[in-house]
């Protein structure tokens, strides 16, 4: 059985991790084998790269350095976690994947689509998510939620224009490839967001059955 690769995307404060865990519980209740993971991270080495990417520092990080670190972590994550799980026939639920790179390093940092796409092909080959859930909400709501969590990481400290570009990139990618993306209104209450996920569950189960 071939596995199913589902990614959850969205800006800061969109509730991706919480809703990833909820979706996993719903799938497991139907007898589905689910693996939860995240990017950057997912393996001990990739988590160390995550720390480099997120920790505020007195030394600035160039956009190219950031991009290469993201894909270095992704290469390790794919080799050690994602590809083996898919080969076992599991459903992989991943908090962020390459759409986040296009949104943050492309939209936010201004790196070209072509540069990101070249690394995407090099690291991933033909592997792409089967389905991507984009948790969308206004920037000001997301930043307010992120601030309420406490100390901000290096990305969360960016300004409004950065996150406007991140959001626009996500929405444009979803519009360009509607077969792969599902938009979820993350500005709703948690109960309403999870009700939206419940409505998606039959589609996910059908995809998993092939």
UniProtKB/Swiss-Prot annotation:
Transmembrane segments: none annotated. SUPFAM superfamilies: P-loop containing nucleoside triphosphate hydrolases (SSF52540). GO terms for molecular function: ATP binding; dTMP kinase activity. ATP binds at residues 10-17. InterPro entries: P-loop_NTPase (IPR027417), Thymidylate_kin-like_dom (IPR039430), Thymidylate_kinase (IPR018094). Belongs to the thymidylate kinase family. Phosphorylation of dTMP to form dTDP in both de novo and salvage pathways of dTTP synthesis. This is Thymidylate kinase. It comes from Pseudomonas syringae pv. tomato (strain ATCC BAA-871 / DC3000). The lineage of its organism: Bacteria, Pseudomonadati, Pseudomonadota, Gammaproteobacteria, Pseudomonadales. The gene is tmk.
